[in-house]
């Protein structure tokens, strides 16, 4: 009986496949992380069983990789108790081929590590003077505003050229936007939709702080822009001839505050907690009393049930540069926070 002979080629092929499997397994044994912390450890696990090449192909500057093939329990301990994974290898050691995105550039820091920093392109900016931002703050120029937007305020835009003002007198709003003065006498540029559709439901009616019923929020916005000052919302529904706050039903957790100056009620939020901060600016209220902040004034109004409004920033003993204009407009001061305009 003749026994079959094993072919040496088959054994070599088997060994070759086994080596290939072990090589692939070794290449995929690492873990990919989204950043390397200051303590040198990898944090925020992105994906397991990735090679360094696969992990670093994402192009992110902060992406890092660890070689150890560990179980889920070890990964959990690293992330929760140890401040991250040890033996962290950053994907990028230099700024070569690093894409930080628009408005940013890669630069080596003091520790000789690549970092994305804000570096907006300001070469095409023609206006070199100060600008007023959407946050109501004055920036020394548009480039400084762009840097602030890059760092922490992605929605920040230029409202108008020049310093932020207290009146609309010298404000030139861009495009079709209109200047409106808010409750604290700060000028804002607001874009309004002048074409308002007819209301489809009686629930759309709104009563303005001027005692006028508006068909919808759009109609109230339009009237605000035409007036040039904030009208504000008194309460939802048609205006009624109320004798007191007992006749007015407020919704959304609001409380009725009575305005003795015009003999009307207004629904206001009264659940705001005032922060214990010395950085708040005092305000002079319509009762000629000085409050530590606008929030403190609102708190006093909610406690008494009587509407209080800001006459001007600062103490009532201080002289406002716009006193004359405020006195001229006193009879038509239907001011309201700018946030109420932008919400609609």
Curated annotation (Swiss-Prot):
Domain TB residue range list: 30-103
Occurrences of domain Kazal-like (ranges): 112-166, 186-241, 264-318
InterPro entries from the UniProt entry: Fol_N, Follistatin/Osteonectin_EGF, Kazal_dom, Kazal_dom_sf, TB_dom, TB_dom_sf
Record-linked Pfam families: FOLN, FST_N, Kazal_2
Main location, first listed in the record: secreted
Disordered: annotated segments: 314-344
GO cellular component: extracellular region; extracellular space; nucleolus
Cysteines paired by S-S bonds: 32-55, 42-88, 56-91, 95-106, 100-116, 118-150, 122-143, 132-164, 168-179, 173-189, 192-225, 196-218, 207-239, 245-256, 250-267, 270-302, 274-295, 284-316
Glycosylation, residue list: 124, 288
Classification via CDD domains: KAZAL_FS
Location of the Follistatin-like domain: 94-117, 167-190, 244-268
BP terms from Gene Ontology: cell differentiation; negative regulation of activin receptor signaling pathway; regulation of BMP signaling pathway
Keywords: Disulfide bond, Glycoprotein, Nucleus, Repeat, Secreted, Signal
Repeat in keyword set: yes
Biological role: Multifunctional regulatory protein whose primary function is to antagonize members of the transforming growth factor beta (TGF-beta) superfamily including activin, myostatin, GDF11 or bone morphogenetic proteins (BMPs). Mechanistically, binds to these ligands in the extracellular space, blocking their type II receptor-binding site to inhibit downstream signaling. Plays an essential role in muscle fiber formation and growth both by preventing the repressive effects of myostatin and through SMAD3/AKT/mTOR signaling independently of myostatin.
Quaternary structure annotation from Swiss-Prot or TrEMBL: Interacts with GDF11. Interacts with activin A/INHBA. Interacts with myostatin/MSTN.
The protein's name in its UniProt record: Follistatin
Designated gene of the protein: FST
């Amino acid at each position: 009986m003749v026994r079959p002979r094993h072919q040496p080629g088959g054994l070599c092929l088997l060994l070759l496949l086994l080596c290939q499997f072990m090589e692939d397994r070794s290449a995929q044994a690492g873990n990919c992380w989204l950043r390397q912390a200051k303590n040198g450890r990898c944090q925020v696990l992105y994906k397991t069983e990735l090679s360094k090449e696969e992990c670093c192909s994402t192009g992110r500057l902060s992406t890092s990789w660890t070689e150890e093939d560990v179980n889920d329990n070890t990964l959990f301990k690293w992330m929760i108790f140890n401040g991250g994974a040890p033996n962290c290898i950053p994907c990028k050691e230099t700024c070569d081929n690093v894409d930080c995105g628009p408005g940013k550039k890669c630069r080596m820091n003091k520790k000789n590590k690549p970092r994305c920093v804000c570096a907006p392109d300001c070469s095409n900016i023609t206006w070199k003077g100060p600008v007023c931002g959407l946050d109501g703050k004055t920036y020394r120029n548009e480039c400084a505003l762009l840097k602030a937007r890059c760092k922490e305020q992605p929605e920040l835009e230029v409202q108008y050229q020049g310093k932020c003002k207290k009146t609309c007198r010298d404000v030139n709003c861009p495009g079709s936007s209109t200047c409106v003065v808010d409750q604290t006498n700060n000028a804002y540029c607001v874009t309004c939709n002048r074409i308002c559709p007819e209301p489809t439901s009686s629930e759309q009616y709104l009563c303005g702080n001027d005692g006028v019923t508006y068909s919808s929020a759009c109609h109230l916005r339009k009237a605000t822009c035409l007036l040039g000052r904030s009208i504000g919302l008194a309460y939802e529904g048609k205006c009624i001839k109320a004798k007191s706050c007992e006749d007015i039903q407020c919704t959304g957790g609001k409380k009725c505050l009575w305005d003795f100056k015009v003999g009307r009620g207004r629904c206001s939020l009264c659940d705001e907690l005032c922060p214990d901060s010395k950085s708040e600016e005092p305000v002079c209220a319509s009762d000629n009393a000085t409050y530590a902040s606008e929030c403190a004034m609102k708190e006093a109004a909610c406690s008494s049930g009587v509407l209080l409004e800001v006459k001007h920033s600062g103490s009532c003993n201080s002289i406002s540069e716009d006193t004359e204009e405020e006195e001229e407009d006193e009879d038509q001061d239907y001011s309201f926070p700018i946030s109420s305009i932008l919400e609609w």
